[in-house]
């Protein structure tokens, strides 16, 4: 999304996938150094939101995309553009999950020692989405309780992630996940 022609090609591919019934998940993963400037980054990231079904943002990305310091109001601004669920990762405080009807913060999974937070947001989102997929139904029919369980799973996976060093090495393996996957 940082440069043309990949930016417009990606957006068209997302629109086509959406037309064919694909669930569109989006994590802007903003990295200032990759963009020409902040204005271009914001416009590009915002252009994707109307196509999205579920979206994960960090606190910084939420403020950047909405210019709204109140997280609940900011999430509602994004929800009005199309996504059914917005998850805001809050670091050691957990994650705020918002839909048009509900907004709640799910506390982070307690850990003995935080070693490195690199990749924690990605691990959260992977855990969230994997729990969603286990339900085997459309995002539009998930109950609030099921959405909350997705967030709990995401926090559990992120909790494992932060106890190791490095982005890729910290991603939990199948054995490490076996206890929480059965939940």
What do these predicted regions represent?
Residues 15-16, 67-183:
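Conserved phosphate-binding/catalytic region of the ribokinase-like
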Residues 1-77, 83-84, 93-94:
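Conserved beta-alpha-beta core of the PfkB/ribokinase-like small-molecule kinase fold
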């Amino acid at each position: 999304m940082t440069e043309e022609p990949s930016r417009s090609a990606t957006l068209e591919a997302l629109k086509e996938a959406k037309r064919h019934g694909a669930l569109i998940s989006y994590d802007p993963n903003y990295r200032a150094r990759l963009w020409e400037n902040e204005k271009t980054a914001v416009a590009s990231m915002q252009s994707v939101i109307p196509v999205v079904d579920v979206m994960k943002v960090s606190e910084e990305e939420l403020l950047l995309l909405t210019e709204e310091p109140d997280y609940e109001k900011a999430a509602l601004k994004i929800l009005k553009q199309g996504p059914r669920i917005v998850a805001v990762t809050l670091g050691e405080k957990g994650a705020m999950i918002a839909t048009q009807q509900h907004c709640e913060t799910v506390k982070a999974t307690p850990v003995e020692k935080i070693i490195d937070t690199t990749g924690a947001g990605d691990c959260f989102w992977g855990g969230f989405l994997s729990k969603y997929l286990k339900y085997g139904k459309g995002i539009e029919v998930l109950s609030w309780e099921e959405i909350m369980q997705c967030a709990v799973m995401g926090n559990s996976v992120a909790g494992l992630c932060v106890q190791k060093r490095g982005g890729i090495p910290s991603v939990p393996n199948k054995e490490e996940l076996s206890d929480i996957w059965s939940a």
